[in-house]
Amino acid sequence: MSQELTINADQLTEEQIAEFKEAFSLFDKDGDGTITTKELGTVMRSLGQNPTEAELQDMINEVDADGNGTIDFPEFLTMMARKMKDTDSEEEIREAFRVFDKDGNGFISAAELRHVMTNLGEKLTDEEVDEMIREADIDGDGQVNYEEFVTMMTSK
């Protein structure tokens, strides 16, 4: 597992690492190379992340191996790399939803689905379109909302 985490941190650009180091240093008050768990949320928010308290606690528990309440820079990098990866996929799904939701009302209708699929070169019958909607339509209202779309996209 630790090998996989290292790979994630290795995928950061030098610019990203420098940016994270700068933010890390701002909150490493005594300059000893560690930040306290309380400061973690502030650091992440300064980098455009918006973790919940539960997410922060989970990340701290995963990273703070010795349980002393502080995080060193390599641990911090690992955590940020993982967090960035999660954010990207979430943003990609949101972007895909916007593509399908032509009128921006928060729902994908059969007509919108047919339109996008046709633009992608997929000629579907009405039955095929209805079947796709039915598969994703958890609450049975005949259209697909964002939550249903996320479920569909992440269940594969």
From Swiss-Prot:
Pfam families: EF-hand_7. InterPro entries: CALM/Myosin/TropC-like, EF-hand-dom_pair, EF_Hand_1_Ca_BS, EF_hand_dom. This is Calmodulin. PROSITE patterns: EF_HAND_1, EF_HAND_2. Ca(2+) 3 binds at residues 101, 103, 105, 112. Belongs to the calmodulin family. It comes from Strongylocentrotus intermedius. GO terms for molecular function: calcium ion binding.
